Amino acid sequence: EEVDQVAEVDVVVEEVTEPEPEPEPEPEPELEAVDPFAVEVTPGTDSDSDGLSDTEEKTIYNTNPRLPDTDSDGFLDGNEVFHRYNPAAPGTLLEEGIVVLETRSVAESETVDYTFTFPAVWETSVDSDDVFILDAQTGQGFRIWAVEKDSAQSLDAWTEDMTTLEEPLEGTTKNGLPMMSSQNQLIAYVDLGFAVLVMEYDTGLKARVDYLQTMQMMLNSVE
């Protein structure tokens, strides 16, 4: 009986290696919000350590930036400005025409007025939101406005509800009005009872603070 012979054939099976999956790309880290204008604030030079910057002494009060008590009355120039007195001679800043009185109305209620004083040499304007703008003509200035508030609400409660201040500084103006300010003292809120006056210091592109004592003087004049 014949038997068909089948030739043996070596079959080579190549091992197929599956490619490893590509690793998933790592998520890009979230970018933190960065204020492009956030720079460190530089205090103005105070050569005689009297509480007034040299710029304030030269451009507003006509005092000697190297003499802490220009009129030799026993009071530092900066202390006199804080209390709204003329540091160069007897009399108040208002009496001597160094500051002028401004009367403003709360935007939402034109029948309710408040007043404050500011340096007479500064330029003023009012923007479309009824914000009063003070231009010191040195790249610095102030923005002042008022918003209505329930007279029964404390300034502390209003500040917590309406602002983002962290650890605000509490104080009282020379006219006895409650006041809150930021840690750097560049923004302040004064309780008018029926409203809150807001005063913001605009340090400008150079981020200098030459008018901090003048800001305190203006806050002390609010009524």
Regions found by a protein language model. Give the residues of each.
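Residues in Ca2+-coordinating acidic/glycine-rich loops
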Residues: T45, S49-G51, P68, S72-G74, ...
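Secretory pathway targeting signatures of secreted, lumenal, and periplasmic proteins
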Residues: T111-W158, L186
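N-terminal, intrinsically disordered, polar/charged segments of Gram-positive cell-envelope systems
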Residues: E2-T45, P87
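Signature of long, low-cysteine stretches enriched in small and polar/charged residues
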Residues: K149-D210
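Proline-centered structural pivot motif
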Residues: A38-G44, T55-T70, G78-V99
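Second-shell loop/turn segments in exported
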Residues: V41-P43, N64-R66, V106-E108, I144-K149, ...
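Extracellular, beta-strand-rich glycan-interacting domains
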Residues: Q216-E223
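Short, hydrophobic/aromatic-rich segments at coil-to-beta transitions
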Residues: L101-V106, D129-V131, E170-S181
